[in-house]
């Protein structure tokens, strides 16, 4: 039977860019540094809308410096829209193991990303 989710990336590879990782953060006036997305699931396969959470470190950046942690955030967004907002791509890449395979990807700086909620304060 066909996969009811439609196409699903299991071994994704993305080309490196030309921006050093420290410049991705250092050039930010104000933004968020997200170190990991977790529990990502498809919401709409044709529009590539995914929902998930940040995990293992989400930080506020001001004046190019990490100034402190923020709570984990929920997102629901089209990955196609996110990729349309790429401002810079790191030259460094990482191999990340996932539930259904692995990905070799650089870090990205996006001009915008849609977060829809946050975890409760502790």
Q: Language-model features: where?
A:
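N-terminal small-residue-enriched
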Residues: 1-122
